[in-house]
Amino acid sequence: MEQISNIAGGDTTKETMASLGLICEKDIHEQRLKIDSFIASPFRRSMNSLVERAQATAQSQVELMNLKADLREAEDELVKVLAVKTRKEARQMGIRDSISATQSRIEVLRRNLQLQKSKKDDSVRIISQQLQALSKSKDNAGKVTEDKADIHEAISWYNHALGFHVEAGHGVKFTFTNIDAKRPTREFSFTVHYGNDIYTLLDSDLQLDYINEMVQELNKTNDLFRFVRLMREQFLKSTLSELPTHSGQLQQETSAISASAPAISFSTDTNMSTPENKRSKVQVNRRQKRGSESPLLAPVSTSATRRSSRFKGKK
């Protein structure tokens, strides 16, 4: 402004205007430079910043791609690890289930073993009992065989010495021979029926004295063998009364034969429901002891056998 005032004071207007124009252009140029510099500096900085950012972005993208690749690899590794872990867990679960099943099976086998042991003990006990029973059965079988032999011997003796035999039917028929000295083959018989716990005399070849009392005594004592012996004695008495001589001797020898007879007992069953049941069962049991109450319990003696032979000879 001082220049303008100096020019305005001494120069002309033209020069003044030219000077002012130069001054204005100079100022405009300076202001333009200032503006250009003001505008260019931030832009340059912005461009530089943008370039740096672009470079950083590119580098970040490269790093991002690398990170993505690493992430994919990590994911693949994770999948593999998870698969291995899953297989291990599945294997562990299978092992646990197998262990549990094995433990259950062991428990079942333990219970079965205990059960088998108890069954074995029971079987051993039963076998021991069966062996004892078998041993007793063998002993009993031997005794039964001996008893059968004794029974056959007794029956044979009665059949031979007394001509005695039994028939089953409606009741039991007892038949004797070797009673009548004149006719040794003459048969004497009587039939006894047993039913409702009562003995009944159905038939007899001879009308004997005291027969009703004998039947009553039989029902009281249930001693059928004694009744049979008494009946034979009654038959014998009826025949001895017919002999004129030696009747006492014959009676004594016949009594000796009866005394030497092996003891037997009879049990009858006269159920009439079926034809098979019509057959009465006759059981003959050899007594093992000698009794003082009956002479029939005495065993067979040699003298008795000799007497029976003489008796047959006399007849």
UniProtKB/Swiss-Prot annotation:
Coiled coil start-end: 57-91
Keywords from the named record: Acetylation, Cell cycle, Cell division, Centromere, Chromosome, Coiled coil, Mitosis
Gene Ontology cellular component terms for the protein in this record: Ndc80 complex
Location relative to the cell: Chromosome, Centromere
Highest rank taxon of the organism: Eukaryota
Residues found modified as N-acetylmethionine: M1
InterPro entries linked to this entry: Spc25, Spc25_C
TM ranges: none
Function statement: Acts as a component of the essential kinetochore-associated NDC80 complex, which is required for chromosome segregation and spindle checkpoint activity to ensure proper cell division.
Subunit structure: Component of the NDC80 complex, which consists of NDC80, NUF2, SPC24 and SPC25.
Protein's recorded name: Kinetochore protein SPC25 homolog
Organism: Arabidopsis thaliana
Gene this chain is encoded by: SPC25
